Amino acid sequence: MQPSYKDLHCACQSNSQTNQSSVYSMSDDIWEDDDEDEEQEEYDRGDNSNDYNKDGVGSRQQNKQTQSLAMNEIARRHRKQGYVDGLAKHQEENLQKGFDFAYSIGADLGIKVGRLLARACIADGANNDLKDKSGGSGNDLGSLKECMNALNISKVLDLKYFDDHLNLKDGKHGLIEEWQNKSN
């Protein structure tokens, strides 16, 4: 519900001044809407004299192109976000399956590496005892540091030891096999 003219007044102005300015502001709002209707009527009649700006470039055509570009950009963003959301959901669903499948392989490799490191630790301690007593060279397994560097997790899990389905090539791990042969 709109206030009546009598209700509109300002403390610093008389009622007649307030009413007059209110009428002007209300009439501005009314005429503002009619401009859009006139433009549509001109367009419907085929009167396109206002379609060009002073440079001769079509302003309505520019507006349509700008709107089209904006819509294309919005559509592109929505498609991209939908793709990203779908990919994330798929990864979440399959992450547990992949973990369950590869866990036993990783655990087996970890146990083998742990045994090799334990042997290297024992051999390193024995080598140190032999060196202290006789100055001898010791075991072929090498030092603990050498074994730890060679059997680092990033080297053990290098893709060159796995096929496309992340299974061990030929059922054996080349690096671990090499160190197992050294320890025997």
Curated annotation (Swiss-Prot):
Residues 43-54 have a biased composition (Basic and acidic residues). Its main location: cytoplasm. The keyword Metal-binding does not apply. One of its GO terms (biological process) is protein maturation. Keywords: Cytoplasm, Nucleus. Residues 1-68 are annotated as: Disordered. It is found in: Cytoplasm; Nucleus. Residues 82-122 are annotated as: deca-GX3 motif. May form a complex with LTO1. This is Protein YAE1.
